[in-house]
Amino acid sequence: MFILILILNIRNENLSTFNSIVTHDLMLSAAKTLAKLNPDMTFIYVSGSGTDSTESGRTMWARVKGRTENELLRLPFKAAYMFRPGLIIPANGVKSKTKSYQLMYDVMKPFNPLLKRFGSVITSEQLGRAMVRVGKDGYSHSIVESSDLKKIGKY
């Protein structure tokens, strides 16, 4: 079993060309190569909550991620899953190397127990477990929303 995990989180509207190149073009290029090398693999793409599969919404990043998901699902993999986590809270004291993210995590830390009750909030540990489980065992839907990821990623 081979699982490829790529997380691209670019949401700045002013970087729409870069966003499209990195989120769509680079991802599709890598995925097409992998599909040729091993069509029997399971491919998991982490996009994010709010991704627009219709490709017609108002938000550029959501349309690009939706287009990327749609094209990935058409590739000849054994299985492909599009993970759409919302807020990901780092688990086990993991620190972000991005200072602005770490500042946000530090400010939000007192609220984490409350935030974890919402379906769109997931820990990095739950997300990792969900990736391994879906990669190994599959899942009934190709689009996996944050609330489902949370259930799959439970101990």
Where are these regions (language model features)?
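NAD(P)H-binding glycine-rich loop region in Rossmannoid oxidoreductase-like domains
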Residues: 1-35, 52, 135
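SDR active-site strand-loop-helix element
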Residues: 43-49, 83-85
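Short, flexible segments with low predicted structural confidence
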Residues: 42-45, 98-100
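Non-catalytic positions within long, well-ordered alpha-helices that form the structural scaffold/packing
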Residues: 35-36, 73
